[in-house]
């Protein structure tokens, strides 16, 4: 395997010292090393992958030096437009080094949401005219691939290094941003889920939130038909919930969101607000971290999410960080929806981390979809 310090030093020797991106589980060791060894001016954890390409382009325009964009392959969709209309050699001709974690590689077992993306990862690069190398796990071979990448950048090309599982040696994040919040996300999810009505449904975002909701239902002996577990498509749970809420105005629809996911496509909040579904509750479990992929920080706890929600038109927005506050707000929520309508935002600040024995959904995405559709139909 490759030592993270070896890889980053080779990039530094060749003039690459600026990074932007969205953390990925396959890249967690290299992302952790970058977080520990680059200041905030040279490592920007972006809202989404397309935004990271924009940051890299801006860095090049200002310095003449290419930047490195790190991401999971699930984020390829977010970079298609800036690759085609910003960095492409027929447009602005801006070099960028892409570091792409290859989830769902053919022949390697992975979760359902990664299978299709894994199949098309290199094909998308080919279609976009992006040359790439699957990074070797041997340092001497990897060094030669880095040299090839640097030559491409010198020719003002975009070049991708595609990263398989277990490419980088373990590296534990040292500069961990610890919040002093007492409540776990799992406890918060259980508290909200327990307050739901019989006809209510939940759209939960990707990562730990959906996994913890699934386990709550299982522990209570309940079915999963009321929950749409958005195992992929990060950042879009609020819009899935909006689509349901508008089509089913007689049902209360809850979006269980994370801070990283909400920030990824924050403009969606404005659309929710302007459509103003009276049956829509947007719950953001905010721990200030990309918890599912290594714990790298988000700006979640550094911004005022309720103020953002109110500014775009949410009828109410409340922040809380204790079970007592939650139970108080949840007890009056129905009357608030009846009086002022929706959407309403509930920001619940929670501590980082999850149970080590946390499982994954045992139903398939298709089974989950069909059960929810039957529930909504009845």
Which stretches of residues belong to each language-model region?
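Thiamine diphosphate
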Residues: 1-126, 130-242, 246-251, 299, ...
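DG-centered beta-turn motif at the end of beta-strands
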Residues: 71-74, 251-262, 267-269
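A short alpha/beta connector and helix-capping loop motif
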Residues: 84, 93-96, 266-286
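Active-site regions of oxyanion-processing enzymes, predominantly non-cytosolic
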Residues: 157-162, 341-348
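Short, basic, low-complexity termini and linkers enriched in Ser/Thr/Gly/Pro
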Residues: 331-341
């Amino acid at each position: 395997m490759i030592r993270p310090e070896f890889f980053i030093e080779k990039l530094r020797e060749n003039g690459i010292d600026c990074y932007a991106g969205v953390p990925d589980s396959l890249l967690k060791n290299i992302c952790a090393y970058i977080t520990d060894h680059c200041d905030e001016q040279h490592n920007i954890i972006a809202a989404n992958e397309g935004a990271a390409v924009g940051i890299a382009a801006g860095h090049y325009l200002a310095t003449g030096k290419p930047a490195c964009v790190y991401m999971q392959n699930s984020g390829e969709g977010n970079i298609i437009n800036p690759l085609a209309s910003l960095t492409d050699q027929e447009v602005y001709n801006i070099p960028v080094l892409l570091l792409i974690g290859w989830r769902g590689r053919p022949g390697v077992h992975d979760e359902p949401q990664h299978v299709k993306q894994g199949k098309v990862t290199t094909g998308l690069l080919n279609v976009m005219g992006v040359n790439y190398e699957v990074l070797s796990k041997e340092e001497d071979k990897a060094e030669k691939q880095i040299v090839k990448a640097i030559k491409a950048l010198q020719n003002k090309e975009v070049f991708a290094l595609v990263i398989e599982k277990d490419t980088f040696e373990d590296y534990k994040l040292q500069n961990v941003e610890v919040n002093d919040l007492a409540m776990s996300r799992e406890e918060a999810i259980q508290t909200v889920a327990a307050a739901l009505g019989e006809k209510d449904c939940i759209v939960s975002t990707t990562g730990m939130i959906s996994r913890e909701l699934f386990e709550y239902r299982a522990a209570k002996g309940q079915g999963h038909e009321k929950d749409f577990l958005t195992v992929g498509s990060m950042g879009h749970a609020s819009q899935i919930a909006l689509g349901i809420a508008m089509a089913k105005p007689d049902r209360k629809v809850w979006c269980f969101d994370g801070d990283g996911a909400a920030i990824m496509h924050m403009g969606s909040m404005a659309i929710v607000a302007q459509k103003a579904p009276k049956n829509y509750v947007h719950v953001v479990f905010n721990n200030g971290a990309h918890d599912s992929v290594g714990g790298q920080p988000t700006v979640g706890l550094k911004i005022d999410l309720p103020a953002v929600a109110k500014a775009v038109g949410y009828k109410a927005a409340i922040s809380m960080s204790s079970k007592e506050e939650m139970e108080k707000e949840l007890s009056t929520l129905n009357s608030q929806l009846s009086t002022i309508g929706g959407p309403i935002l509930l920001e619940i600040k929670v501590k980082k981390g999850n149970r080590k024995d946390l499982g994954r959904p045992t139903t398939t995405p298709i089974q989950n979809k069909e059960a929810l559709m039957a529930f909504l139909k009845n």
